[in-house]
A protein has these predicted regions:
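Glycine-enriched, solvent-exposed interface loops adjoining structured elements
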Residues: 1-157
């Protein structure tokens, strides 16, 4: 049986035998957290995307707005693709302690939720290709109350 937001909320309330208002008001948050965990843990192919764009001569590269987790990041120079190695921020800072050091990026790290850090800082404007898992709209956010997880993986919810 596929779940919609309404049927999933009802199933949860029936299972725990509670219609208490504080509990019911928190159901969307519980559901979003469950979806997030499923998406991160399972890394289903249906939620993979790629994005290509140019990065400025800055050590920071913006992540797509629907970004959940990276699979790979590459720099494309004259049609040749070179994959960057994913590391921790501290390693990048040790590798290039002076952000003014420029070159073709070799490494990347998560700077924050919306940004990657590159090392060394790109010497010019390069084309980057990111393969990543994206965050689809939650079953709580879609107009019709349905989602891929609710339709195809209802037992996981």
């Amino acid at each position: 049986m596929a779940y919609t937001f309404t049927t999933l909320k009802t199933a949860i309330q029936d299972y725990v035998q509670s219609t208490e208002s504080t509990f019911v008001s928190q159901l969307p948050r519980f559901i979003i957290n469950a979806e997030e965990r499923i998406l991160k843990e399972c890394q289903l192919d249906v939620f993979r995307k790629s994005s290509q764009g140019t990065g400025s001569s800055s050590a920071y590269l913006q992540k797509p707005s629907d970004f959940l987790a990276q699979n790979s990041l590459s720099v494309i120079i004259s049609g040749s693709k070179t994959f960057l190695l994913y590391k921790q921020v501290t390693m990048l800072q040790d590798y290039t302690p002076d952000p003014a050091t420029t070159g073709v990026p070799k490494y990347y790290a998560d700077w924050d939720e919306a940004t990657f850090l590159l090392a060394p800082t790109p010497a010019s404007v390069y084309t980057f290709e990111l393969h990543y898992l994206y965050r689809p709209l939650s079953i709580t956010e879609t107009g019709d109350g349905t989602s891929w997880l609710g339709t195809n993986a209802e037992l996981a919810l």
